[in-house]
């Protein structure tokens, strides 16, 4: 790792690379295509950002594209990538759906070396000849299990068909779906599989449990679980009505709760 990045790592409080960061560094730095499998929160983002940036030369066009499944994740990736890229005089631009196209086109005119974005918007700008991919040497597909299905799968494939044939590919995911076992078949390039899920305990050992609870008793069970010391939870619902009923029950019993749903006002 170059000194600038090593110093940034140390300032962020990291004493050593995580298993996924260590395992993918050399293959990515050498230009190999990889599938990186690691638990959520294990440092996958820096695992690909650092070696990819070390291969890029300033002022020689867009050399890396990082594809994310959502605008929110793309913005997070942009922030992380930019925090390292600025150390070596590289520019990063975010290209996402739902954002102002004219502003994005203005950013592309500043000749960034790295583009981070969502597949639909990236593909649209390539097809409109606004984003020129002929210098791209690396394409990273983050949350690959999510992106490589449905319409986004087709968009990712088309993006890769528009970049040079010798492009390096990186696919990263916390879970391995069937499509991730057939990457060479779909993308025509040998991909080295790197799986550290069994050895990476960065976030501690995850224990799974199952409780069979009737629908009418689920809110009460949540209330009981809150008696566990330092209990925090994300609870997913199939219907907004059930979400609101459970929220009302918990609030009535003085349990702190917040909700997020698609029909809430966005700010």
Predicted regions and their residues:
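Conserved pre-motif I regulatory segment
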Residues: 1-37
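Conserved nucleic-acid-binding Ia/Ib motif block in the N-terminal RecA-like helicase ATPase lobe
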Residues: 2, 60-127, 135-138, 256-259
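Conserved helicase ATPase core of P-loop NTP-dependent helicases/translocases
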Residues: 102-107, 244-249, 255-267
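Post-DEXD/H (motif II) to motif III coupling segment of the RecA-like Helicase ATP-binding lobe
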Residues: 124, 132-199
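Conserved interdomain hinge at the start of the Helicase C-terminal
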Residues: 204-249
């Amino acid at each position: 790792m170059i000194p600038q990045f090593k110093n940034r790592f140390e300032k962020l409080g990291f004493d050593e690379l995580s298993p996924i960061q260590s395992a993918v560094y050399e293959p990515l730095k050498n230009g190999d295509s990889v599938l990186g499998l690691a638990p959520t929160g294990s440092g996958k983002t820096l695992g690909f950002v650092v070696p990819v940036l070390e291969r890029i030369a300033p002022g020689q066009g867009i050399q890396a594209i990082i594809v994310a499944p959502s605008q929110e994740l793309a913005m997070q990736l942009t922030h992380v990538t930019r925090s390292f890229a600025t150390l070596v005089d590289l520019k990063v631009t975010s290209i996402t759906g739902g954002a102002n196209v004219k502003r994005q086109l203005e950013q592309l005119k500043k000749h960034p070396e790295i583009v981070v974005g969502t597949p639909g918007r990236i593909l649209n700008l390539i097809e409109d000849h606004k984003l020129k991919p002929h210098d791209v040497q690396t394409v990273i597909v983050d949350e690959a299990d999510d992106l490589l299905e449905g319409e986004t799968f087709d968009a990712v494939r088309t993006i890769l068909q528009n970049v040079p044939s010798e492009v390096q590919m990186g696919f990263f995911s916390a879970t391995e779906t069937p499509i991730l076992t057939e990457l060479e078949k779909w993308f025509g390039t040998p991909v080295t599989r790197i799986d550290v899920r069994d050895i990476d305990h960065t976030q501690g050992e995850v224990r799974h449990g199952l409780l069979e609870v009737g629908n009418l008793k689920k809110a009460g069970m949540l209330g009981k679980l809150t008696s566990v010391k330092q209990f925090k939870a994300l609870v997913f619902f199939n219907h907004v009505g059930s979400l609101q009923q459970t929220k009302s029950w918990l609030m009535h019993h003085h349990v702190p709760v917040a909700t997020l749903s698609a029909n809430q006002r966005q700010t």
